Amino acid sequence: MNNIIKMLNEEQMKKDVPEFGAGDTVVVKVRVVEGGKERLQAFEGVVIAKRNRGVHSAFTVRKISNGEGVERAFQTHSPIISDIEVKRRGRVRRAKLYYLRERSGKSARIREKLSTK
């Protein structure tokens, strides 16, 4: 029984999900259906939380739109998500960046992680 569940979960998981974590700036391209048309909508922001649970993995992205903070939670392996692109790697010391909700301006900045080649 356990093996069957594992097989079904692995079948439904996406293979092309990039490696990212809290503090990274990502662009999530979401399929949106308006009327009869389907289009891609980009949501760019900072990952403030990530939950790794296999098929049930999720992450939360926060951005500032017109001076107002907007957060959106995405299921990592959802068919609604067409692409996840990592724009910038952030260097943070926490797994969950909920403290950014109270911050604005310069205090909400995240240091950039320098890549080692």
From Swiss-Prot:
Pfam short name (any one): Ribosomal_L19
Q: Does the keyword Ribonucleoprotein apply?
A: yes
Q: Carries keyword Ribosomal protein?
A: yes
Any one GO CC term of the record: cytosolic large ribosomal subunit
Q: Which GO terms describe its biological process?
A: translation
Q: Which domain of life is it from?
A: Bacteria
For molecular function, the Gene Ontology terms on record are:
structural constituent of ribosome
InterPro entries hit by this protein:
Ribosomal_bL19, Ribosomal_bL19_CS, Ribosomal_bL19_sf, Translation_prot_SH3-like_sf
Which keywords does UniProt give here? Answer: Ribonucleoprotein, Ribosomal protein
**What PANTHER family has UniProt attached to this entry?**
LARGE RIBOSOMAL SUBUNIT PROTEIN BL19M, RIBOSOMAL PROTEIN L19
Q: Which family does it belong to?
A: Belongs to the bacterial ribosomal protein bL19 family.
The job of this chain, per UniProt, is described as: This protein is located at the 30S-50S ribosomal subunit interface and may play a role in the structure and function of the aminoacyl-tRNA binding site.
The identity of this protein, by name, is: Large ribosomal subunit protein bL19
From what organism does this protein derive? Shewanella woodyi (strain ATCC 51908 / MS32)
